[in-house]
Amino acid sequence: QNNYDGSIRILFNGRHFGTGNFRYDSWRVPMNIALDYSWSCADKEWQRAYGEKIQNFFYSQGIDTFVDQYCVDGSIPEEQDILAAGGWTKVLRHSVGLVSTVAAASLLCDHEISREFIDRLWNSKNEPYEDGYFDAYYDGLLRLFAFMHLSGNYRVITPAE
């Protein structure tokens, strides 16, 4: 994690907090950028480039097999750097939450593969993984918000004048 000024966040006994890997909290970033794009479109060129870059990365990892945690260099983390989901076993999954947020990034993109990410979200199932782990809260809500984004129904609600 970083501080708001971009410096590395240091915690207990001068140790860096976490590994800096892309994982659960990071999943929200593509959808947050899609939200900003939908509501304000303040930096369209950068947002489009970001959307296509992140979708290209996950597509290159296998659209049906990409995992839910990566090192910042794009490699798979070593076992000691994998964060267990919800106290469950330390495994990498093809998580519905990440499928959802990467699909929401399709709002930013003009390339052909965006439709494939939307199709994967549409056909995703909110059910336990093969190992029995199930997170209706995080995976389920990211899935719901992605559907809202892509349907055009995630809007700013303003008071009636």
Where in the sequence are the language-model features?
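Extended ligand-binding clefts on enzyme/binding-domain cores
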Residues: 1-115, 137
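Terminal, non-catalytic domain-edge segments
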Residues: 32-35, 39, 105-161
